[in-house]
A protein has these predicted regions:
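Short, low-complexity disordered leader/linker segments with a strong preference
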Residues: 1-26, 385-387
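Immediate post-signal peptide segment of exported/extracytoplasmic ligand-binding proteins
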Residues: 18-29, 60-65, 158-165
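Beta-alpha junction/loop-to-helix N-cap segments that form part of ligand/metal-binding clefts
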Residues: 24-26, 39-46, 58-131, 201-208, ...
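Extracytoplasmic "Venus flytrap"
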Residues: 25-49, 71-78, 100-101, 170-179, ...
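Hydrophobic alpha-helical segments within soluble ligand-binding/sensing domains
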Residues: 80, 127, 141-166, 206-209, ...
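Extracytoplasmic ligand/sensor domains, especially the bilobed periplasmic-binding protein
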Residues: 93-198, 245-264
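Extracellular/periplasmic periplasmic-binding protein-like sensory domains
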Residues: 143, 236-307, 379-385
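Segments of small-molecule ligand-sensing domains
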Residues: 293-303, 314-374
């Protein structure tokens, strides 16, 4: 009798949990939470979770909690595919997120399309499919974006060079990074620069000296790198060990602010679209408070991207009528404007034709030896995102 009562109680508990789950907005995430790429992606998800917990603590969205289901793919395509299948078929998520290397995109996109569920790239590089004319199901809020970043970086190089530019290139051997550095090489020629060497390293390389050696031998006065941070910074450090004294511009990933302070090299420039904590905008205090309560192990300077992702999720769900379906969420995402409160140069805006943003704003920072601090050397420069 006791055994039967226990089974009945468990069944009631299971039913109650299921009912509660149906009352939540269920969002699925496949992310590189472990493995070599985790330092770039895990902080995004941890900060996003902290933001969602903060929202839930205030009553959720439209009176309903947001449930995040996060699965680790270790930046492996096969794991990302399995995660996407489970989240879509078993958990019935109304939105799927990818925060991993671009090598995981193809299987994730395929599963999302098959299930007709919107796919949101958060913390992972924005694929061109999110640019106008956008793929109907793919969206991205991540700071960095193919082609536009190289346009902004090389414009800065040109504006800050009195001598002829001899440009070296460095990238990781992953699809989007390789394509972007090839694009930048072609773009440099149209700007009157001379591309002198391009080095592509495996993900990750145990030693970057061979790649740096080839770059140094070509005698560039600038090097541009656009890849995961490990590739960017280790190539730079290897060049410095070899005695190269030129200027190096690279993408401002999550850890760039801390790394500028560690390296203290005035000729290392980082280009980005998220305000650094050194910029001290008011919402930085909220990020500190929310992520402190969540006891996140990463430095607060790593967490802006994830906070933005949480803001985007909240805004999309607020515009989604209850009960949520993937189609309702998609309709909300197709007409979305998110006030980022100074974390970027303007709001993030998606339209039916543009799932990236309508404007991309860039700043550039470096270490100032005289001030013994990180300083901004270029304020927000806007690039219109068009067809």
């Amino acid at each position: 009798m006791k055994r039967a009562a226990m089974i009945f109680a468990l069944a009631l508990a299971a039913f109650g949990a299921q009912a509660q789950g149906q009352k939540a907005y269920v969002i699925g995430v496949t992310a590189a939470m472990t493995g070599p790429a985790a330092a770039t992606y895990a902080p995004v998800i941890e900060a996003m979770k902290a933001y969602v917990d903060h929202v839930n603590g205030k009553g959720g969205v439209n009176g309903h909690p947001v449930q995040l289901i996060v699965l680790d793919d270790s930046a492996e395509p096969s794991k990302a595919a399995a995660n996407a299948k489970r989240l879509l078929s078993e958990d019935k998520v109304v939105m799927l997120l990818n925060s991993s290397l671009s090598s995981t995109y193809a299987p994730t996109v395929a599963e999302a399309k098959r299930a007709n569920v919107p796919l949101y790239f958060a913390g992972s590089v924005c694929p061109k499919d999110t640019y106008p004319p956008a793929d109907p199901m793919q969206f991205c809020s991540t700071a960095f974006g193919a082609n536009l970043d190289s346009q902004a970086a090389l414009a800065f190089v040109k504006a800050n060079s009195k001598e002829a530019v001899r440009l070296g290139f460095a990238a990781m051997a992953i699809p989007i990074a390789r394509a972007e550095i090839d694009y930048a090489e072609g773009l440099s020629k149209t700007l009157g620069m001379t591309p002198v060497e391009k080095q592509i390293s495996p993900p990750p390389a145990p030693d970057y000296t061979p790649f740096a050696t080839k770059l140094k031998e070509a005698n560039p006065n600038w090097v541009y790198s656009w890849s995961p941070w490990v590739s960017q910074v280790r190539t730079f450090e290897a060049l410095r060990r070899l005695g190269w004294e030129g200027r190096y511009i690279t993408w401002s990933h999550l850890n760039a602010e801390d790394e500028l302070a560690r390296l203290r090299d005035p000729n290392l420039y980082v280009l980005g679209t998220n305000a650094l904590f050194e910029d001290n905008v008011p919402i930085h205090a909220e990020i500190r408070a929310v992520t402190h309560r969540a006891n996140i192990k990463y430095p607060v300077t790593f967490l802006t991207e994830g906070f933005i992702s949480g803001m985007v999720i909240e805004a999309a769900l607020k515009a989604t009528p209850w009960p949520p379906t993937p189609q309702k969420v998609l309709a909300a995402m197709n007409n979305l404007k998110v006030d980022l409160k100074g974390l970027r140069g303007g709001p993030l805006e998606w339209t039916k034709d543009n799932h990236f943003r309508t404007k991309q704003y860039y700043r550039v920072w470096h270490w100032d030896s005289g001030k013994n601090a990180i300083v901004r050397v270029q304020d927000w420069q806007a690039i219109d995102v068009k067809r």
